[in-house]
UniProtKB/Swiss-Prot annotation, chain A:
It holds the Pfam family COX2_TM. This is Cytochrome c oxidase subunit 2. The gene is MT-CO2. It is found in: Mitochondrion inner membrane. It comes from the Eukaryota. Its cofactor is Cu cation.
Length: 227, 160
């Protein structure tokens, strides 16, 4: 989860999120280079070191056309690579359905049995010591780690959005539509997210918690759920 | 001529029609079904384009013959194996994008149409279970319950 006053991303826990973090670092470097150049030129200009009598500026015109084009290519190539990577077809091991309601989520695992439960935020008054305020839920989603998971997201009433930043996932929950997304968790852990589309009074109070565990623990949990 | 129920041109399509044999390749079935979904029994031969390792390879011409129980038994065995190894709904190339609404709807329809067709013929409805498993995996339970109620009332909007 995010810590207070955190500026950067949460630690990436899926391959796509790792790529996104790297791309962001790269884009930020490009932005830093451009800002430094602009600041330098601004300083020169203010010190009147850039005045010139020339009316013919072909060379400099060429430079400040070609250089931005190169910068754009440097940004576009990794961006498109990640975009296509996100769309790669990876046969999922499990399908999880997330249905948004006002103001809780329902999760369904119906590949084999009809497993379904609601997930409400733990109110702050009931929060055990050391747990995270406005992020904990009564029933977490449990998934096997290092397995491709398909999530089908929809809503029952108004627009919601299912987001887990550590996994690089954010998908709108639209009534009457099934939106598909997928992820693989690279390690076991607990990953938090919050509803990301304004949905009424308690929009800030319907978080998402994904618990990624080794397969045998997932199987044990799902047996408990079905009994 | 009896009309076979529509079958999915996805990667592992079960063919519930016992009167049709298309050789060993179930992938070929997809192209044939796309070509003439309702008139498969009359298709003399077809070139089967299969996707292998990212490139489209033209396989040999597939001879479509009308056979009886032997082919049907092989097909039933195939679908039983597929059902035994079922993990979750596989990728369906008819619905490659984010919006999977139609995937859920289509499999729900296909299951009920398959069941109805098999019941009409008095044939084994086991192949229809594929569509059942897929729609169960993808469709929200509340949608399925609502549609089941509509079917019972006779107000279901789809054609079964």
């Amino acid at each position: 989860m995010a810590n207070h006053s955190q500026l950067g991303f949460q630690d990436a826990s899926s391959p796509i999120m790792e790529e996104l973090v790297e791309f962001h670092d790269h884009a930020l470097m490009v932005a830093l280079a451009i800002c430094s150049l602009v600041l330098y030129l601004l300083t020169l200009m203010l010190m009147e070191k850039l005045s010139s009598n020339t009316v013919d500026a072909q060379e400099v015109e060429l430079i400040w056309t070609i250089l931005p084009a190169i910068v754009l290519v440097l940004l576009a190539l990794p961006s498109l690579q990640i975009l296509y990577m996100m769309d790669e077809i990876d046969e999922p091991d499990l399908t999880l359905k997330a249905i948004g309601h006002q103001w809780y989520w329902t999760y369904e695992y119906t590949d084999f049995k009809d497993l379904s439960f609601d997930s409400y935020m733990t109110p702050t008054t009931d929060l055990p010591l050391g747990h995270f305020r406005l992020l904990e839920v009564d029933h977490r989603i449990v998934i096997p780690m290092e397995s491709p998971i398909r999530v089908i997201i929809t809503a029952d009433d108004v627009l919601h959005s299912w987001a887990v930043p550590a996994l690089g996932v954010k998908t709108d929950a639209i009534p009457g539509r099934l939106n598909q997304t997928s992820f693989i968790t690279t390690r076991p852990g607990v990953f938090y997210g919050q509803c990301s589309e304004i949905c009424g009074a308690n929009h800030s109070y319907m978080p998402i918690v994904v618990e990624s565990t080794p397969l045998k623990h997932f199987e044990a949990w799902s047996s408990l759920l079905s009994s | 001529m009896e009309v076979p129920p529509p079958f999915s041109p996805s990667r592992s399509p079960p063919n519930p029609s016992p009167a049709l044999s298309v050789g060993r390749s179930t992938l070929c079935t997809s192209v044939i079904s796309l070509a003439a979904p309702r008139a498969v029994a009359s298709l003399p031969a077809a070139l089967c384009a299969v996707r292998l390792g990212g490139s489209v390879v033209r396989a040999a011409a597939v001879k479509v013959t009308l056979t009886g129980t032997a082919a049907a038994a092989a097909m039933a065995e195939d679908i039983r194996t597929k059902l035994e190894h079922y993990k979750t709904a596989p990728f369906d190339s008819r619905f490659p994008n984010q919006n999977q609404t139609r995937n859920c709807w289509q499999n729900y329809l296909d299951f009920h149409r398959c069941e109805k067709a098999m019941a009409a013929k008095g044939a084994d409805a086991t192949p229809c279970q594929w569509y059942y498993r897929v729609y169960k995996s993808i469709c929200p339970t509340s949608w399925v319950t609502t549609w089941d109620e509509y079917r019972e009332e006779g107000t279901f909007p789809g054609k079964i």
